[in-house]
């Protein structure tokens, strides 16, 4: 092995070690509850995005429509919000759901002032994609929930219960919330 190849291998090795060490240093500065909330939120957000972009967007091609009343319709599938909420009902060790300041249903309003404040903070700062915080006997995390497709925005804008009628693709609509009991 010549000197140039050895130098390349050394640089790659250093980059690999540094890239592995940075997350470990960050993890050492983060509480286990914070890490857990972030992992859960990232997973929920990924599943919702995949469901919205692949299942919902492609369903039209086969004569299936996303519908709020999907369970009673012969060619209906659940809406992305219903998908997240349905997954949340299957989980017993923590709460997973959706909240917003202008939800279609009152059950999707924030449960505490801290959740309301966190949502307002996210609305005021578009670069803030995730927040975690302690709130009483719970540790909570919020992941920004956007109108992933124009169909998401259109569905909310056209819904009779919607207090907001001007959503566009990419707008922050609320948040995916995880509530972890600390006691």
Language-model segments: residues:
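Extracytoplasmic c-type cytochrome modules immediately beyond a signal peptide or single-pass transmembrane anchor
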Residues: 23-147, 161-183
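The canonical Cys-X-X-Cys-His
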Residues: 148-160
């Amino acid at each position: 092995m010549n000197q140039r190849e050895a130098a390349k291998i050394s640089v790659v090795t250093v980059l690999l070690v540094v890239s592995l060490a940075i997350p470990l240093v960050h993890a050492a500065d983060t509480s286990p509850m914070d890490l857990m909330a972030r992992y859960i939120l990232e997973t929920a957000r990924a599943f919702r995005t995949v469901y919205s972009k692949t299942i919902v967007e492609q369903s039209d091609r086969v004569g299936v429509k996303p519908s709020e009343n999907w369970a009673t319709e012969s060619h209906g599938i659940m809406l992305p919000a219903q998908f997240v909420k349905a997954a949340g009902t299957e989980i017993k060790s923590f709460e997973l759901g959706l909240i917003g300041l202008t939800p279609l249903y009152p059950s999707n309003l924030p449960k505490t002032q801290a959740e309301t404040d966190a949502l307002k903070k996210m609305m005021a700062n578009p670069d803030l994609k995730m927040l975690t915080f302690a709130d009483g006997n719970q540790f909570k995390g919020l992941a920004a929930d956007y109108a992933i497709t124009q169909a998401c925005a259109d569905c909310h804008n056209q819904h009779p219960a919607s207090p907001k009628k001007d959503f566009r693709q990419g707008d922050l609509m609320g948040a995916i919330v995880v509530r972890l009991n600390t006691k």
